[in-house]
């Protein structure tokens, strides 16, 4: 979400870290890194992306539809360089990375996140600490609520006489 990137990232983290099981954090997720705005299907370098592109071109798909599909689903988005700071190549390398650095690296990077006490990074730290100190999150039962509501993801966590309600929209 371009307008509510920080709020959306925190909400999705809340959903994930409040659920049962082991939450996994992928590189850059804790910073709210976004997908690179590739402008052409040819910008994608992953083998699977290139195969999908070739198959869809052969099937007569429009370039715009191929691009939209790759932007939403391609693995390339998770393989861009980690955005450490606002220096050249986002502080990832002094050379040329295989994947391009996201152009938003000057605004979204680890150095910036560490300087902002309300950043997504610190929110993740708080969620991880909560999971370590609140057994309801690691041992409690899970009960989904409002399963048919397209705008609200809600559930209960119960354990040892306690109940937590998690509501995200």
Residue ranges and their predicted role:
Residues 1-169:
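Active-site and adjacent substrate-binding regions of carbohydrate-active enzymes
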